Amino acid sequence: MQEQYRPEEIESKVQLHWDEKRTFEVTEDESKEKYYCLSMLPYPSGRLHMGHVRNYTIGDVIARYQRMLGKNVLQPIGWDAFGLPAEGAAVKNNTAPAPWTYDNIAYMKNQLKMLGFGYDWSRELATCTPEYYRWEQKFFTELYKKGLVYKKTSAVNWCPNDQTVLANEQVIDGCCWRCDTKVERKEIPQWFIKITAYADELLNDLDKLDHWPDTVKTMQRNWIGRSEGVEITFNVNDYDNMLTVYTTRPDTFMGCTYLAVAAGHPLAQKAAENNPELAAFIDECRNTKVAEAEMATMEKKGVDTGFKAVHPLTGEEIPVWAANFVLMEYGTGAVMAVPGHDQRDYEFASKYGLNIKPVILAADGSEPDLSQQALTEKGVLFNSGEFNGLDHEAAFNAIADKLTAMGVGERKVNYRLRDWGVSRQRYWGAPIPMVTLEDGTVMPTPDDQLPVILPEDVVMDGITSPIKADPEWAKTTVNGMPALRETDTFDTFMESSWYYARYTCPEYKEGMLDSEAANYWLPVDIYIGGIEHAIMHLLYFRFFHKLMRDAGMVNSDEPAKQLLCQGMVLADAFYYVGENGERNWVSPVDAIVERDEKGRIVKAKDAAGHELVYTGMSKMSKSKNNGIDPQVMVERYGADTVRLFMMFASPADMTLEWQESGVEGANRFLKRVWKLVYEHTAKGDVAALNVDALTEDQKALRRDVHKTIAKVTDDIGRRQTFNTAIAAIMELMNKLAKAPTDGEQDRALMQEALLAVVRMLNPFTPHICFTLWQELKGEGDIDNAPWPVADEKAMVEDSTLVVVQVNGKVRAKITVLVDATEEQVRERAGQEHLVAKYLDGVTVRKVIYVPGKLLNLVVG
């Protein structure tokens, strides 16, 4: 064994061994308990970042630990390979998205191997290959036949210059992010999957997810947004149709003083024919991108349509306004306004001088003061005719019943959740498998024409999708009739909604899933990824699992038993102000810093001498140039050091502050482990451990070893507090470093301790542990070694600490054998100088003894 720890030599050797032996490849084995450990698959952007490294290290630690428990562990990896960034990169680099993507996959695969992750590479998949997306296309056609897929026209952000649809986040200050053209709202036909048909089940089954973070479950509950209320129909004078609104507060209905409709509502459109002001307002709304988050804060605007609706209970005429806070996509495109008891309605009514009618009493029973704001709390009704005096619940039911009896109301359960729009007008995605025949019939692509393959050898102009630009691509024949293929592609959330199931049978050619393999491995035992995926990906992931269950492919209700959301990785951020006042961000690697005595940064500059402004720790990002390249760190310190720091610096679900001093500390620790094993093995073979022959000191050290095994097992397995597990191993290492190594049993005990330490560290730092296990002559490869088991007998304390009091005051603390008698404890106490001093020349009148804890001598 060489004396120095050289990670660059051992890591590549160990990785080659894993590759050649196919160590982490697994198959179904009914005789073993399975464990499916999965990290969210990466987008092949070109290089791994520290967020990836943290996510995958957590997964690898859990997978390796479960494997050492003797389980059949599946840990696969793949590539979420479709998506918009590839199109931008292709245009920029004058290539096509496919070669750019495949090059990135090859590069990042090497980076993953360099970090020593124990993946089953035989199951690797890339979602941009026809072998993968063909089954997604087939499944979509089956959902269409079941009535779960439909096409409808819906409003999108449209860039007239690029001739493309933009996501909300691609619209900046009302303009296209790419060409700065003013964005328009445009109605275009799109494909939807009916996730709303599963809304109740998606909501109710959250209660089954005992091992998912409450924050994620709450976010999903709010996103699904189930509410109970009443749908109310209004007659509108001089208008051919009724107006329908939905409310969760029918108790306030007598205070409804106006209605508001979306700018795109047919009533507003009709009114605009003779109202130029309204027509201009509708035009303004059409070109305003409205994301839900922005609606709460934006200025509320409106125009009176001139139409009057009739309040069904009071018979009063109330105005109908077009307002920018009502969206056609939500509900009926019309809302009832109760300005006395809803703050948004109050602000709008105050702005435009509309009637504000209070109908709920304040908590003290007085009429509410509405001079400053609405009263939004629930309470007792007044000013409401026959409903006066009713509380919220009674009024809700009484008004709902009355409206229902009159035929103008209906109790309804509503959801905030909308059906999933899966159409994208982009090129780099899976083609949607639908065709339109010459006679206008729309139908799924026949099975014998699947997969609909996306051509990869294309020229990108950065504006139009190549399959939209090429009229020949869309032409096909169905049932002997000319037809046109759909040129939209799937939302990339489609691919990431079922990949976890395809990992169980990546080579299966008879269908989407091999049910036998899928049901052996599923559900996933632990799924690891960022909390930013709480509502989109993790909701679609659950939805797809239920769709596959209802298609008979899987037999479980939920895709993953446990969800672990790792925290973000933060790093120092620095900038200097340029000549034009702009901020130039400088990488923390290039910052030369001065710190105060507490280690805080007080001054910084870069190599060029610029004075740097330190903005604190923030999430690693390109925009702040504060990302740390994992590859550089691995080359500098080794993969094991990077992995150990990642797991030690912070609890897995909390933010991690990147500190190179911490990385250096992790590296020093591994050098100490190496040194101790080197010194131990240099002394030659070791005798067998004779537990009965150990001295008290040796027993105490062995007790520490086995207590550490018990703690680390609990920390990794049950608590998943990996940082405290590492801290416990470090503490034990400090004791081992000071332990005597001369006697035969000293060395035998050290052998037992080091074999345990190396196995406990193995999930975190597998390369060094693989090597040290061999040097310690452990049996076989450490990858097949069992997890160490704590010896209960060794952990039993044979001595205990007893507090000695004289007349209730503590005079000494003594160590006695656990089974010592009261007499023996008294005798031992009497040997203590301070106790003897207070007993001198006095009589012990009473003895209070709590075995193993307390001895109180009452003297007088």
UniProtKB/Swiss-Prot annotation:
Motif residue range(s): 'KMSKS' region = 619-623
InterPro entries this protein is in? aa-tRNA-synth_I_CS, aa-tRNA-synth_Ia, Leu-tRNA-ligase, Leu_tRNA-synth_edit, M/V/L/I-tRNA-synth_anticd-bd, Methionyl/Leucyl_tRNA_Synth, Rossmann-like_a/b/a_fold, tRNAsynth_Ia_anticodon-bd
Q: Where does ATP bind?
A: K622
A cellular component term from Gene Ontology for this protein is:
cytosol
Its GO biological process annotations read: leucyl-tRNA aminoacylation
The record's annotation in Gene3D superfamilies points to: 2.20.28.290, 3.10.20.590, HUPs, Isoleucyl-tRNA Synthetase, Domain 1
Sequence intervals crossing the membrane = none
The EC number of this protein is: 6.1.1.4
Question: What EC class does the entry list?
Answer: ligase
Q: Name one GO molecular function term.
A: ATP binding
- Locate the motif 'HIGH' region: 42-52
Q: What is its main location?
A: cytoplasm
What's its catalytic activity?
tRNA(Leu) + L-leucine + ATP = L-leucyl-tRNA(Leu) + AMP + diphosphate
SUPFAM superfamilies assigned: Anticodon-binding domain of a subclass of class I aminoacyl-tRNA synthetases, Nucleotidylyl transferase, ValRS/IleRS/LeuRS editing domain
This protein is called Leucine--tRNA ligase
Originating species:
Shigella sonnei (strain Ss046)
Q: Which gene encodes it?
A: leuS
